[in-house]
UniProtKB/Swiss-Prot annotation:
The lineage of its organism: Bacteria, Bacillati, Bacillota, Bacilli, Bacillales. Substrate binds at residues 49, 136, 148. Pathway: Amino-acid biosynthesis; L-proline biosynthesis; L-glutamate 5-semialdehyde from L-glutamate: step 1/2. This is Glutamate 5-kinase. Catalyzes the transfer of a phosphate group to glutamate to form L-glutamate 5-phosphate. It comes from Bacillus cereus (strain Q1). The gene is proB. Signal peptide: none annotated. Belongs to the glutamate 5-kinase family. InterPro entries: AceGlu_kinase-like_sf, Asp/Glu/Uridylate_kinase, G5K_ProB, Glu/AcGlu_kinase, Glu_5kinase, Glu_5kinase/COase_Synthase, Glutamate_5-kinase_CS, PUA. GO terms for biological process: L-proline biosynthetic process.
Length: 367
């Protein structure tokens, strides 16, 4: 089996016991299986939930708190307990772990996004196993975000993973809720996530988790768009993750391999960047960009909206108002208003620029 880069996401329901604490038995089972992946020569990253579930009983809550301050306090206590438990278990296999706590803003800010990429790359090069969680104690997103499902998809794209394994307490995707319908049909393989499939998923999560099947399907769709195939399911024992790679996992495989990888810069533009303005373009420029993969030139620009700087991300729309994509602009809004509609030779005569693309195709994402 060739060396692969694998992201494994383990949800709260797969970690916590019935009283809300960390189940040592379940955690040990997961760690043993992750260690087997490493033993097989694969690079492994772990996205783990469970900080709130691990911490609420230590603070005296009889059950998972429902207030934001209660959840965040529980997460602050639980994250250290969770990491300590992982570190002790992985040490038995001689595996060095590293903790990364991320928030949505770490993805939306280009410099922090690049730093996360560089840090993860160095950790993997050093054979460490990164353990990643949302920074629950200061971030609201995780508490309504889907139990780290989307975080796992975004990280898998960031590191160009070969596969994302989302482990939960349900053995895959069904056309109906299998707990309520005996005739529910299981999907063993889905080539893509269609609107029909997405509509079948419910929002309800498990008792100790926040992410239902809908969040997992949304995460799978995002991962596929970033070139990462997905497995959603469950399992026990040391071989469960290796079995997934062999096609023997107890769940649903999503996506045909190999997927087309999206470069890091385009991932940031597509999924994380903040749009600072809009550019309207004519029909000729639309055809050149969409059908022929060309860069956007000033000659095709008909209107500029907003106030943006060089390097900011802008939306691009047709004269009919349809948004076709977005990208990093090489001109400020003020500069672009002065040269919109001008041919490159006329801009050259002004002597102001040596590169004349408004948005280079390497910094463009179609929507």
């Amino acid at each position: 089996m060739k060396k692969q880069r694998i992201v494994v996401k383990i949800g709260s329901s797969s970690l916590a016991d019935s009283h809300g604490g960390i189940s040592k038995e379940q955690l040990s089972d997961h760690v043993a299986a992750l260690a087997r992946l490493k033993e097989e020569g694969h690079e492994v990253l772990l996205i783990t939930s469970g900080a709130v579930a691990a911490g609420f009983s230590a603070l005296g809550y009889p059950s998972r708190p429902v207030t934001i301050k209660g959840k965040q306090a529980a997460a602050a206590v639980g994250q250290s307990l969770l990491m300590q438990a992982y570190t002790e278990e992985f040490r038995k296999y001689g595996i060095v772990t590293a903790q990364l706590l991320l928030t949505r803003s770490d993805f939306s800010r280009k410099e922090q996004y690049s730093n996360a990429y560089a840090t993860l790359g160095e950790l993997l090069n050093r054979s460490a196993l990164p353990i990643i969680n949302e920074n629950d104690s200061i971030s609201l997103e995780e508490l309504t975000f889907g139990d780290n499902d989307m975080l796992s998809a975004l990280v898998s794209g960031l590191v160009s993973a070969d596969m994302l394994m989302i482990f939960t307490d349900v053995n895959g995707l069904y056309d109906k809720n299998p707990q309520k319908n005996e005739d529910a049909k299981k999907y063993y393989f889905l080539p893509e996530v269609t609107e029909e499939i997405a509509s079948l998923a419910g929002d309800a999560g498990s008792k100790l988790g926040t992410g239902g099947m809908k969040s997992k399907i949304d995460a799978a769709k995002t991962a596929l768009s970033l070139g990462v195939s997905v497995f959603i399911g469950t399992g026990r024992g040391q071989e469960k993750f290796v079995d997934v790679l062999k096609g023997k996992g107890d769940g649903t495989y999503v996506g045909n391999a190999p997927q087309k990888e999206m470069k890091m810069n385009k991932q940031w533009i597509a999924l994380h960047s903040v749009v600072s303005g809009q550019i309207e373009i004519d029909a000729g420029a639309t055809t050149a960009i969409i059908q022929h993969g060309k860069s956007l030139l000033p000659a095709g620009v008909t209107n500029v909206s907003g106030f943006f700087k060089v390097g900011d991300v802008v939306e691009v729309m047709t004269q009919q108002g349809r948004v076709i994509g977005k990208g990093q602009c090489t001109y400020s809004a003020e500069e672009l208003r002065e040269i919109k509609g001008m041919q490159s030779q006329h801009i050259q005569a002004r002597g102001e620029r040596h590169n004349y693309e408004v948005i280079h195709r390497d910094h463009w994402v179609s929507l």
